[in-house]
């Protein structure tokens, strides 16, 4: 898979794309109670944070996760407005190279 460093989503574009995918698929993958909780609390405590892919993704996929091209976006709620997300609703793995659309999601169980 040939990828171009100059053809990547920015960090903001990556966060936005992951959040859009989350919103589109949440109803099919989360409990209704979780969706209500997320929607009620997101304004005050919700967020999406960008990370290099965690090592445990290798249990779910079978290719190299070069952090130059792949990012993990954690979507959920924090205890405080500026706190770290500790109530995770989804972990979204995205390829940031614009010509390689790839997305995997680990949903809250």
Swiss-Prot record:
Pfam families for this protein: DUF440
InterPro entries in alphabetical order: dsDNA_mimic_put, Put_dsDNA_mimic_sf
Entry's family note: Belongs to the putative dsDNA mimic protein family.
Protein task: May act as a double-stranded DNA (dsDNA) mimic. Probably regulates the activity of a dsDNA-binding protein.
Alphabetical list of HAMAP family matching this protein: Put_dsDNA_mimic (MF_00680)
Name of the protein: Putative double-stranded DNA mimic protein YciU
Source organism per UniProt: Salmonella typhimurium (strain LT2 / SGSC1412 / ATCC 700720)
Gene name of this polypeptide: yciU
């Amino acid at each position: 898979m040939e990828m171009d460093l100059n053809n990547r989503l920015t960090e903001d574009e990556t966060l936005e794309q992951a959040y859009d995918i989350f919103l589109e698929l949440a109803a099919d993958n989360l409990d209704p109670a979780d969706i209500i909780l997320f929607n009620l609390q997101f304004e005050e405590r919700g967020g999406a944070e960008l990370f290099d892919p965690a090592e445990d993704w290798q249990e779910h996929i079978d290719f190299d996760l070069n952090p130059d091209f792949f990012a993990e976006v954690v979507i959920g709620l924090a205890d405080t407005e500026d706190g770290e997300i500790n109530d995770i609703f989804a972990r979204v793995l995205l390829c940031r190279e614009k010509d390689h659309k790839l997305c995997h999601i680990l949903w809250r169980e």
